Protein backbone atom coordinates (compact mmCIF):
# COMPACT_ATOMS: atom_id res chain seq x y z
CA UNK A 1 0.00 0.00 0.00
CA UNK A 2 1.32 3.43 -0.98
CA UNK A 3 0.33 6.44 1.10
CA UNK A 4 -0.62 9.75 -0.42
CA UNK A 5 0.90 12.64 1.54
CA UNK A 6 -0.46 16.18 1.37
CA UNK A 7 2.14 17.75 3.66
CA UNK A 8 5.41 17.10 5.49
CA UNK A 9 4.05 17.34 9.02
CA UNK A 10 4.82 14.68 11.64
CA UNK A 11 2.25 11.90 11.85
CA UNK A 12 0.14 11.07 14.90
CA UNK A 13 2.35 8.08 15.72
CA UNK A 14 5.49 10.22 15.63
CA UNK A 15 4.22 11.81 18.84
CA UNK A 16 4.82 8.65 20.86
CA UNK A 17 7.62 7.11 18.76
CA UNK A 18 10.02 10.05 18.54
CA UNK A 19 10.70 10.28 22.30
CA UNK A 20 12.13 6.73 22.31
CA UNK A 21 14.06 7.45 19.13
CA UNK A 22 15.59 10.60 20.60
CA UNK A 23 16.34 8.97 23.95
CA UNK A 24 18.15 6.15 22.16
CA UNK A 25 20.28 8.36 19.94
CA UNK A 26 21.03 10.90 22.69
CA UNK A 27 22.26 8.20 25.08
CA UNK A 28 24.83 6.98 22.59
CA UNK A 29 28.30 8.28 21.74
CA UNK A 30 28.52 8.53 17.95
CA UNK A 31 31.85 8.45 16.14
CA UNK A 32 29.96 8.83 12.87
CA UNK A 33 26.39 9.99 12.25
CA UNK A 34 25.05 8.51 9.03
CA UNK A 35 21.38 7.53 9.21
CA UNK A 36 18.94 5.73 6.93
CA UNK A 37 15.13 5.86 7.18
CA UNK A 38 13.53 2.79 5.60
CA UNK A 39 9.99 3.84 4.74
CA UNK A 40 10.61 7.55 5.26
CA UNK A 41 7.16 8.70 4.15
CA UNK A 42 7.08 12.49 3.97
CA UNK A 43 10.56 12.87 5.44
CA UNK A 44 9.53 14.21 8.87
CA UNK A 45 11.67 11.68 10.76
CA UNK A 46 14.56 12.26 8.36
CA UNK A 47 14.38 15.95 9.19
CA UNK A 48 14.28 15.23 12.93
CA UNK A 49 17.46 13.18 12.61
CA UNK A 50 19.10 15.90 10.51
CA UNK A 51 18.29 18.42 13.26
CA UNK A 52 20.19 16.13 15.65
CA UNK A 53 23.31 16.14 13.53
CA UNK A 54 22.83 13.14 11.25
CA UNK A 55 23.56 12.91 7.53
CA UNK A 56 20.28 11.30 6.48
CA UNK A 57 19.10 9.22 3.53
CA UNK A 58 15.57 7.85 3.26
CA UNK A 59 13.53 5.82 0.82
CA UNK A 60 9.81 5.23 0.41
CA UNK A 61 7.49 3.76 -2.21
CA UNK A 62 5.19 6.80 -1.98
CA UNK A 63 5.88 9.29 -4.75
CA UNK A 64 3.86 11.98 -2.97
CA UNK A 65 5.74 11.34 0.27
CA UNK A 66 9.14 11.63 -1.36
CA UNK A 67 8.04 14.77 -3.21
CA UNK A 68 6.91 16.34 0.08
CA UNK A 69 10.22 15.41 1.69
CA UNK A 70 12.29 16.80 -1.16
CA UNK A 71 10.33 20.06 -1.21
CA UNK A 72 10.31 20.58 2.56
CA UNK A 73 13.65 19.17 3.69
CA UNK A 74 16.40 19.94 1.16
CA UNK A 75 19.12 18.96 3.63
CA UNK A 76 18.13 15.28 3.61
CA UNK A 77 18.23 12.82 0.72
CA UNK A 78 14.86 11.13 0.10
CA UNK A 79 14.31 8.87 -2.90
CA UNK A 80 11.88 6.28 -4.22
CA UNK A 81 12.82 2.82 -2.96
CA UNK A 82 11.45 -0.31 -1.33
CA UNK A 83 12.33 -2.49 1.62
CA UNK A 84 12.42 -5.39 -0.83
CA UNK A 85 15.30 -3.79 -2.79
CA UNK A 86 19.00 -4.47 -2.20
CA UNK A 87 19.43 -1.10 -0.55
CA UNK A 88 22.74 -1.85 1.16
CA UNK A 89 24.30 -2.55 -2.20
CA UNK A 90 23.05 0.78 -3.54
CA UNK A 91 23.51 3.03 -0.49
CA UNK A 92 26.00 1.22 1.74
CA UNK A 93 25.63 0.77 5.50
CA UNK A 94 24.73 3.26 8.21
CA UNK A 95 25.40 3.98 11.87
CA UNK A 96 21.66 4.33 12.50
CA UNK A 97 18.80 2.69 10.58
CA UNK A 98 15.23 3.66 11.40
CA UNK A 99 11.93 2.17 10.22
CA UNK A 100 8.81 3.46 11.96
CA UNK A 101 5.40 1.83 11.44
CA UNK A 102 6.23 0.18 8.11
CA UNK A 103 6.72 -3.57 8.55
CA UNK A 104 3.04 -4.15 9.41
CA UNK A 105 2.22 -3.21 5.80
CA UNK A 106 4.59 -5.79 4.27
CA UNK A 107 3.50 -9.05 2.68
CA UNK A 108 7.07 -10.35 3.05
CA UNK A 109 8.25 -9.26 6.51
CA UNK A 110 11.34 -11.49 6.43
CA UNK A 111 12.57 -9.88 3.24
CA UNK A 112 11.92 -6.45 4.73
CA UNK A 113 13.66 -7.32 8.00
CA UNK A 114 16.70 -8.68 6.15
CA UNK A 115 16.95 -5.43 4.20
CA UNK A 116 16.62 -3.43 7.42
CA UNK A 117 19.36 -5.40 9.16
CA UNK A 118 21.65 -5.35 6.11
CA UNK A 119 21.78 -1.56 6.28
CA UNK A 120 23.16 -1.45 9.84
CA UNK A 121 26.93 -0.96 9.96
CA UNK A 122 29.05 -2.96 12.43
CA UNK A 123 28.75 -1.14 15.74
CA UNK A 124 25.58 0.59 14.59
CA UNK A 125 21.98 0.30 15.72
CA UNK A 126 18.58 -0.17 14.11
CA UNK A 127 15.29 1.15 15.47
CA UNK A 128 12.13 -0.50 14.15
CA UNK A 129 8.57 0.09 15.35
CA UNK A 130 5.21 -1.54 14.69
CA UNK A 131 1.82 -1.55 16.42
CA UNK A 132 1.85 -3.68 19.57
CA UNK A 133 -0.41 -6.68 20.11
CA UNK A 134 -0.66 -8.90 23.16
CA UNK A 135 -3.23 -10.94 25.08
CA UNK A 136 -4.36 -8.18 27.46
CA UNK A 137 -4.61 -5.54 24.73
CA UNK A 138 -6.46 -7.88 22.37
CA UNK A 139 -8.85 -8.85 25.17
CA UNK A 140 -9.46 -5.18 25.99
CA UNK A 141 -10.20 -4.45 22.33
CA UNK A 142 -12.67 -7.32 22.19
CA UNK A 143 -14.44 -6.39 25.44
CA UNK A 144 -14.79 -2.74 24.43
CA UNK A 145 -16.03 -3.50 20.91
CA UNK A 146 -13.05 -1.85 19.23
CA UNK A 147 -11.66 -4.80 17.28
CA UNK A 148 -13.05 -3.58 13.94
CA UNK A 149 -11.71 -0.06 14.26
CA UNK A 150 -8.33 -1.31 15.50
CA UNK A 151 -7.74 -3.91 12.78
CA UNK A 152 -8.92 -1.52 10.04
CA UNK A 153 -10.41 -4.23 7.81
CA UNK A 154 -11.95 -1.59 5.53
CA UNK A 155 -8.68 0.36 5.07
CA UNK A 156 -7.51 -0.34 1.52
CA UNK A 157 -3.96 -1.60 1.76
CA UNK A 158 -3.79 -1.12 5.52
CA UNK A 159 -2.11 -3.23 8.18
CA UNK A 160 -1.71 -6.87 7.17
CA UNK A 161 0.70 -8.10 9.88
CA UNK A 162 -0.04 -7.90 13.60
CA UNK A 163 3.03 -8.52 15.74
CA UNK A 164 3.46 -9.38 19.40
CA UNK A 165 6.76 -8.98 21.23
CA UNK A 166 7.39 -12.70 20.71
CA UNK A 167 6.67 -12.76 16.98
CA UNK A 168 8.67 -9.62 16.22
CA UNK A 169 11.59 -10.93 18.27
CA UNK A 170 11.41 -14.27 16.43
CA UNK A 171 11.30 -12.55 13.05
CA UNK A 172 14.31 -10.35 13.74
CA UNK A 173 16.36 -13.23 15.15
CA UNK A 174 15.49 -15.46 12.18
CA UNK A 175 16.85 -12.71 9.95
CA UNK A 176 20.13 -12.40 11.85
CA UNK A 177 19.58 -10.00 14.74
CA UNK A 178 21.06 -11.03 18.09
CA UNK A 179 21.04 -8.08 20.49
CA UNK A 180 17.45 -6.77 20.65
CA UNK A 181 15.87 -4.53 23.29
CA UNK A 182 12.16 -3.65 23.26
CA UNK A 183 10.21 -0.60 24.40
CA UNK A 184 6.42 -0.37 24.56
CA UNK A 185 5.07 3.13 24.00
CA UNK A 186 1.91 5.20 23.77
CA UNK A 187 0.12 3.76 26.82
CA UNK A 188 0.90 1.57 29.81
CA UNK A 189 2.88 -1.47 28.55
CA UNK A 190 0.03 -4.06 28.45
CA UNK A 191 -2.06 -1.67 26.33
CA UNK A 192 0.77 -0.04 24.39
CA UNK A 193 0.06 1.53 21.03
CA UNK A 194 3.39 0.44 19.56
CA UNK A 195 6.57 -1.42 20.33
CA UNK A 196 10.04 -0.29 19.37
CA UNK A 197 12.81 -2.80 18.76
CA UNK A 198 16.36 -1.47 19.17
CA UNK A 199 18.84 -3.76 17.45
CA UNK A 200 22.58 -3.45 18.11
CA UNK A 201 25.21 -4.81 15.72
PLM regions and their residue ranges:
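Conserved N-terminal segment of class I S-adenosyl-L-methionine
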Residues: 1-92, 96, 100, 109-113, ...
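Catalytic P-loop NTPase motifs of RecA-like helicase/translocase cores
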Residues: 106
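Feature marks short, surface-exposed loop/turn motifs that line or immediately flank catalytic pockets
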Residues: 123, 134-136
Amino acid sequence: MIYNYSDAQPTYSNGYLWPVLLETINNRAWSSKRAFDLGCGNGATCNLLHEHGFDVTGVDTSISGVMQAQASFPNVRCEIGSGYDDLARHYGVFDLVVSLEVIEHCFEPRSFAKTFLSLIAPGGIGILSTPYHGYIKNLALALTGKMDSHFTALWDGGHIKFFSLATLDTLLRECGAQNIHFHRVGRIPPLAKAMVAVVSR
